[in-house]
Design a protein with these regions (language model features):
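Short catalytic micro-motifs in class I SAM-dependent methyltransferases
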Residues: 12-15
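C-terminal lobe and adjacent flexible extensions of AdoMet/dcAdoMet transferase-like proteins
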Residues: 79, 99-184
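Conserved redox-active cysteine motifs that mediate thiol-disulfide chemistry
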Residues: 18
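A short glycine-rich, Lys/Arg-flanked "PGG" loop and its adjoining helix->strand segment in the class I
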Residues: 21-36
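A short acidic, Gly/Pro-enriched loop at the edge of an enzyme's catalytic core
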Residues: 1-8
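Glycine-rich, phosphate-binding/catalytic loops in enzymes
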Residues: 25-27, 55-56, 174
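Conserved catalytic/acceptor-binding region of the Class I
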Residues: 37-100, 107-123
């Protein structure tokens, strides 16, 4: 029910939202006044090594574009949240070979890139992808492992209390005034 949730936690889900502003507005409706939202999601440096390989091969990006943390903060404010705090970190994953990297990427989820290949690809594509990754991977560790970056964006904000409209003359009941004083 609207206004019934005191804390909303969304871990690694927001970047999958097709319409993030609509989702943030929905969160705003669910939260009670002074409710707290906290989330993590992927940021724009995610899969940068893989995108570099795709670009070198002349392929479209391997995944949809991820939203920058500053834009998430702006969207929180635009949807009525207060005091947004944003942060990010980069995590580097290491894989022994391209097959392990591909398998891990498949387990992560879906690809919303509108330019992705429209049909399923066969064994020939899988072999070509493995070969291109093996031959053109930009960042290998000294022991030969494939390093893949994930940018993790963290954010939290509050749903502010409803404010009283201020006009040339404003009326506030005694009970409302007491409630305002108690909350300070």
């Amino acid at each position: 029910a609207a206004g019934s949730v005191e804390m909303l936690w969304a871990n690694m889900a927001l970047h999958w939202a097709a319409e993030p502003m609509a989702l943030l507005r929905q969160w705003q409706q669910w939260l009670a006044p002074e409710g707290f939202v906290m989330f993590s999601c992927l940021g724009p440096d995610t899969l940068r090594e893989l995108n570099a390989v795709y670009a070198e091969a002349g392929w479209p990006p391997c995944a949809h574009a991820y939203t920058d943390m500053h834009d998430w903060g702006d969207m929180l404010v635009q949807t009525g949240f207060a005091e947004p705090v944003m942060d990010m970190e980069r995590i580097t994953l290491h894989y022994a070979n391209p097959d392990q990297l591909i398998q891990d990427l498949r387990s992560m989820g879906r690809n919303f890139n509108p330019k992705r290949h429209p049909t399923c690809r066969g064994k020939g594509w899988a072999e070509q992808l493995t070969r291109v990754l093996r031959d053109h991977w930009p960042h290998r560790s000294p022991d030969g492992q494939y390093a893949l970056t994930l940018e993790i964006v963290y954010g939290h904000a509050l749903k502010p209390k409803a404010r009283h409209a201020v006009d040339t003359t404003t009326s506030i009941s005694l009970d409302e005034m007491k409630g305002m004083l108690r909350s300070k």
